[in-house]
Amino acid sequence: MLEFSVIERGGYIPAVEKNKAFLRADGWNDYSFVTMFYLTVFDEHGEKCDIGNVKIGFVGQKEEVSTYSLIDKKFSQLPEMFFSLGESIDYYVNLSKLSDGFKHNLLKAIQDLVVWPNRLADIENESVLNTSLLRGVTLSEIHGQFARVLNGLPELSDFHFSFNRKSAPGFSDLTIPFEVTVNSMPSTNIHAFIGRNGCGKTTILNGMIGAITNPENNEYFFSENNRLIESRIPKGYFRSLVSVSFSAFDPFTPPKEQPDPAKGTQYFYIGLKNAASNSLKSLGDLRLEFISAFIGCMRVDRKRQLWLEAIKKLSSDENFSNMELISLISKYEELRRNEPQIQVDDDKFTKLFYDNIQKYLLRMSSGHAIVLFTITRLVDVVGEKSLVLFDEPEVHLHPPLLSAFLRTLSDLLDARNGVAIIATHSPVVLQEVPKSCMWKVLRSREAINIIRPDIETFGENLGVLTREVFLLEVTNSGYHHLLSQSVDSELSYETILKNYNGQIGLEGRTVLKAMIMNRDEGKVQ
């Protein structure tokens, strides 16, 4: 029979044991509740396994009573008044490596909510559950991701859903399907709308936000697609909704953030607007938000690793690489060592850390600062089945940095089983996603039509992509318009080239030759 020993922080764990589990008290004050333990087990073969952090609460628990003070120091089965939950998916990944019998006996003994999911209905109003155990974890993860990996199944899953908008004054009916296939090449976890300004891209994204934050809305809603039936997505289908927009001119006011997983889908906003005051955030506000998100990433091993991987990928941009942002981790660890009496979620720690790294933040361009802030916040809040809505990421980013950011975002979504939908007018975004994930948005008065591009978009030439999406606009503007005026003057190819002092690129010369050929054949341009 498996036996448990509960020990103090720093308590002794023997080198050799069998069928034994040790719960080392952490003492971490988790928003006033002290529930954390570190689980180490010796399986039926005597193999030692470090499993990870687990939070244990009990029915009726008050903030002033720690779990450690009440739990028996030796037991083989916790009473039903207790319940437990691993802090992250890594806890269940480590458990999945144990034999089926051993891991399930262990989890049943500590009343784990993944193997006892029916208990959630009985304890859903317990303050310790909602404040401590579900901090950073959602119900969808308990039923989905945690349960899957515990049983050795893949962490990821496909998405099959549609966004629906019913007709309203100024708008027509609209249904947009989305498909995400696990392990597809190229990745299908980033979808995009592209079209000219004013065609309705941002309006569609804002409707999606309303569909999630106001699920009773009958004008905008998401539906789940399968082969048999299409129905509205259930509550909690998306773990969280994250909207990202750094436009100061968008009239849309973001809803108030909803970070409580016990209330269903969480909502997070990344951008310039202050929803509470309907004003723009200051640079100081944005930097403090970054620091809060960075600390959130550092506190969880998996998030820390994802942040580190993201920064390494973004460092393909030379300027980004020269900032040596990975050193922020050592600055964080140094402050923790120097100020052990200050909790990392204390405002005092935030201020001290801000003072320590201010020089890194002040020397960043607006584009690099936005990328760092955005990816850090995304690592902190994106989890299983998160939906990220991004409005015009190209606004502050040059093309190489935009491409690097999109690849980093895709890898993060793959690691966290999420999906992103982007509104853009940049062909660079098209170049990074396949045709099956791209919609051209066309508008004629009230009617909005969406169609797939006629050509494959992933890795295509930017000029080809620009003509594919903006054909009419391209031929009536920019260098096309200037060349057309020269052709209309009945000048020869050589004369026009001379007039421009030979300063016409290869593609422009090809366009010019085609215009002259059509003119000379009597075709109207």
Swiss-Prot record:
**Which terms in the Gene Ontology molecular function aspect does this entry carry?**
ATP binding; ATP hydrolysis activity
What superkingdom heads the lineage? Viruses
| Pfam families assigned to the protein according to its UniProt record, in alphabetical order | AAA_21
Q: Which InterPro entries would you find in this protein's record?
A: ATPase_AAA_core, Bact_Antivir_Def_Nuclease, P-loop_NTPase
Q: What protein name applies here?
A: Protein ea59
The scientific name of the source species is: Escherichia phage lambda (Bacteriophage lambda)
